[in-house]
Amino acid sequence: MHVYETYCRETFDEKGRLTQIQLDYPADFNFAYDVVDAMARLAPQQKALVWCNSEGQEAQFTFADISRRSSQAAQVFLQAGIRRGDRVMVALKRHYEYWFVTVALHKIGAVLIPMTHMLTQEDILYRLRCAPVQAIVCTPQDQVPARVAGAVAQAGGACKLWTVQQDIPGFSNLT
């Protein structure tokens, strides 16, 4: 049985074509635990993600890798005071860490607010004022940390800041 069959009922016609799908999941369904971690238990070494970039770098991750690294990120967030319902803006461009952060935020029940790396400082400030944010996780590239830090300072400077792959003054490095 596949993990999805735990939460989906399918009906097929005589030619094997899908005719109906019914979702059947509990009220406390959590994608991170119920799908990602379940896959990590059932098929830990199965390839879950193949990542590459325009510079020719490539990385591959198994379900066990994503489960472990998302749990580590979830612990970092929890230790920093991020809790269920807290809002976290994420601008990770095309970094593979996006997947660890996304699953981690699902695990703790935080709300991920996606943010493009192309936003100006004023755009970020607008979002901070519209949606009280407890944290921001961003790429270290393209001057994004400077724009984020500037917007946070203008907004009153109360949220936690993380980046990935590189140490940036004023930000904790999530990796």
Language-model-detected regions and their locations in the chain:
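N-lobe entry segment of adenylate-forming
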Residues: M1-F61, D65-L78, D167
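A generic structural signal for short
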Residues: D24, T62, M89-A91, L112-I113, ...
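Residues that cap or initiate secondary-structure elements
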Residues: F29, E55, Y96, M115, ...
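Acidic side chains
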Residues: D34-D37, D86, D123, C130
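Generic structural signal for beta-strand residues in well-ordered domains
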Residues: A40-L42, G81-R83, Q154
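Conserved AMP-binding/adenylate-forming core of the ANL superfamily
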Residues: Q45, L49-V103, T120-L125, S172-T175
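Structural core segment of the AMP-binding/adenylate-forming
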Residues: Q79-A80, V103, K107-T175
